[in-house]
Structures are given as C-alpha cells and as structure tokens.
Amino acid sequence: MSRKPLIAGNWKMNLNHYEAIALVQKIAFSLPDKYYDRVDVAVIPPFTDLRSVQTLVDGDKLRLTYGAQDLSPHDSGAYTGDVSGAFLAKLGCSYVVVGHSERRTYHNEDDALVAAKAATALKHGLTPIVCIGEHLDVREAGNHVAHNIEQLRGSLAGLLAEQIGSVVIAYEPVWAIGTGRVASAADAQEVCAAIRKELASLASPRIADTVRVLYGGSVNAKNVGDIVAQDDVDGGLVGGASLDGEHFATLAAIAAGGPLP
C-alpha cells in the first residue's frame, strides 16, 4: 500500500509565539502548495505558540497542519500544569507527540503512561505520534529490535485494533537525537519493518499496512531522501532542522519526491 509521507517538525522548547509566526510563514513561503498533494507537513510547537499558529494557519488557509508536544492523560480537573486533549482539539491540533525520549528520560514517563496518553489523544480526535527508541548500549548489544518491539507493545497497550490504525509511530534511536549521528537508511528500515510486523500481530496486516511509521534522529535535507525511500519508513520526526524554515521546506519537498516542476 502507498502511504503518504508525513514530515513533522518537533520544535521542542524553542521559539516564542512571535518567532513561531515567522517560522510558519517562512515554511509556507518556501514550500509551494503542489507539494502537499504528495507529503503531509506538520509543525509541533510549544503549547504557548499553538494559538498563534492556529490563527495564522486558519487565516491564510495554509495546508500545513500542527500539533502539540504532549498532553495530559486526564480530561480536566486538579492537575496543575497539565494540558488536556480537549484544549488541544479546540486549538485545531491534528497531532500530539506522546512518549518522546526526552519525556521518558527527564520526566520518567513509562509505557503505561504513554499508552494512557495515546488513548486520551484518540478520544479527543487527535492523532498520537507514539515515540519509541533505544539507547546506544541497547543498540551496541544487538538488542535494539527486541527493545523497540517491547516498548511498542507497552505504549499501545489497551488500544483496540482500529485505534492502532489511527496512530503514527515514530522510531527515534535515542543515540541519534540531536547528536548529529544518524542511523543508516538500512538501520531505520530494519526497525521500522519490525514495527510494522508487530503492528500486524497487535491489530491486523490490513491495519499495519495503513499505519505511518516515521524515523526521528538528526533528520535533515541530506539524509531524508534515503530514509523515506525505505519500504517501511513513511516520513520523519524532525528536530533541530525544523527550526530553519527554508531547510525544513526543502526536506519536506525531498520527501514528496521533489523538486517538482
């Protein structure tokens, strides 16, 4: 099955709302509309930027979509500092990242919490981008495939087969995030193919064939072409390279098979 690539730019804790507007405008200017027929493009700004991004996207009728970097597993209530899926849906978000390695590492989030957040996202009509990935010691020990499959199972626990069909999976080897090191295209394919095989077991082969599996970890315009050319890699979760509007647009154009005439 042909799956439309998704290029999602995770801004992490960068850019205030004024800077967010400038970056989205730069991306929109640098990536002509014709590319959006071949690639879905999303930005994932900090919470404080979302309303500004929504206003710009809606006002200028941009084909760019956007999402949030996290959400609460709770719908509302006395959870100081949490942001609910309902709030994100009202802000027009299409996606929400759950289980990013930085959340797992710095906030001690485990698979059970990630699964709860994914379920909450789906409940509110958001597409969760469920992140999994291994540290360098696991990779060097040759246990990277088994590690990712175990993390995948835990992070999707409790979801029905049809719900699994509504998620995006992002494979992000932790040792490649922000380091300049990048898994080879073959490395990415190995794990992403194993992920798809496990999705077929958890849901069905039909559903597994529809789920987009992204690669994340020092993705840039130089390597994205080789990565998305792999059979089971359907795009990228882009970090630092997404903060440069022109570079990010170039990256998305390559993922679309461009440059287009």
Curated annotation (Swiss-Prot):
Main location per the UniProt record: cytoplasm
Catalytic reactions on record: D-glyceraldehyde 3-phosphate = dihydroxyacetone phosphate
Residues annotated to bind substrate: 10-12, 178, 218, 239-240
Spans through the membrane: none
Thermal activity profile: Optimum temperature is 37 degrees Celsius. The enzyme is stable up to 50 degrees Celsius. At 55 degrees Celsius, the enzyme retains approximately half of its activity but it is completely inactivated at 60 degrees Celsius.
GO biological process: gluconeogenesis; glyceraldehyde-3-phosphate biosynthetic process; glycerol catabolic process; glycolytic process
Pathway: Carbohydrate biosynthesis; gluconeogenesis; Carbohydrate degradation; glycolysis; D-glyceraldehyde 3-phosphate from glycerone phosphate: step 1/1
Activity versus pH, per record: Optimum pH is 7.
Function of the molecule: Involved in the gluconeogenesis. Catalyzes stereospecifically the conversion of dihydroxyacetone phosphate (DHAP) to D-glyceraldehyde-3-phosphate (G3P).
Protein name: Triosephosphate isomerase
